[in-house]
Amino acid sequence: MLFKALIRPAMFRTSANDPEIAHHWLMNRMATLSHSQTALKIIEAANAYKSPALERDIFGVHFPNPVGLAGGFDKNGIALPALAALGFGFIEAGTVTRYAQPGNARPRIFRLSVDNALINRMGFPNDGADAIHERLARLKKPAIPIGWSIGKSKVTPQEEAIEDYLYSLRKLYDFSDFFTVNVSSPNTPGLRKLQDKEPLDQLLQAIVQESEALAQRTDSPTAKAVLVKIAPDLTEDQLDDVIEVCLQRNIRGIIATNTTLARTGLRQTSSESGGLSGRPLHTRSLEVIRYLSQHLDNKIPIIGVGVSSGPMTPGEP
């Protein structure tokens, strides 16, 4: 109540010209709380809700509940313990790239308050796989599943993309319960071309094979699951290609969806480039999820992203 009444409005006022200020303010405080066991216990006691009815066992991972925090919130893994204490069933951290990169120039997040939406063109700002590996080696892993989203560095040529992904996979393998292959951000030039059938097939084949090889080297009984995150702007033919590749390459889950380049239905006009998320994407995300569900026939789990801002209505997946 205090957060909604006082803290949130103050954060919005002070970050009106650059919403990223509010995000960094919150992340820094969550990072501080992550180093206090007392604070973590208090946060968990106030937020955690446990019920056997909510538990799920999917691709060899036990989830205490099916509601997770999507990638992009904690890009560098600085606040995972505090975020886990909020009651999430899992956290997807990242996206991480092989090389540290600042992302695109600020401001790069824009609020569309009338539409309950955001436009972002972040461009995968992160500390890089090496630095994040060192950080995670020093921190205690939260009790809930942690997945890491991996993407292509901006400086890496398209023809070297596979090795770029594999480098991050190797660096983060010991600290992750599953991996998300991000090929759908609209803010890295050429990244979405990796969703095309042939490059997607080559990329996912290499990542799954490397995950299996790493499992053997570490005497792990099973390889870490590999998931893929797709764009909402794909046509049905493109979705069919994604489904075919995922089934062929033993992809363990499809995350639907990332942000959209479309601006359909907006009441608040904006000329800013980037990916749109929030309420205007709700319908399209559900359309993609339904299409995947109808054509996958329960062969691969589907993780919906950004389609819930509260209790879902009857009939929603």
Task: Please place each PLM-identified region on the residue numbering.
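Active-site glycine- and acidic-residue-rich loops that bind
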Residues: 153-166, 193, 199, 227-248
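An N-cap/entry alpha-helix motif that binds or orients negatively charged groups
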Residues: 2-56, 120-125, 129
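Active-site-adjacent beta->alpha loops and helix N-cap segments on the catalytic face
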Residues: 99-108, 129-130, 187-222, 235-237, ...
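A gly/proline- and charged-residue-enriched helix-loop-helix capping module
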Residues: 94-144
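Catalytic cores of alpha/beta
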Residues: 76-85, 234-248, 293-294, 298, ...
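Short beta-strand/loop segments at the ligand-binding rim of alpha/beta enzyme cores
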Residues: 60-68, 142-149, 213-234, 294-305
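Glycine/Thr-rich beta-alpha phosphate-binding loop at enzyme active sites
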Residues: 34, 38-49, 186-199, 244-298
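Conserved, mostly hydrophobic/aromatic
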Residues: 18, 69, 91, 132, ...
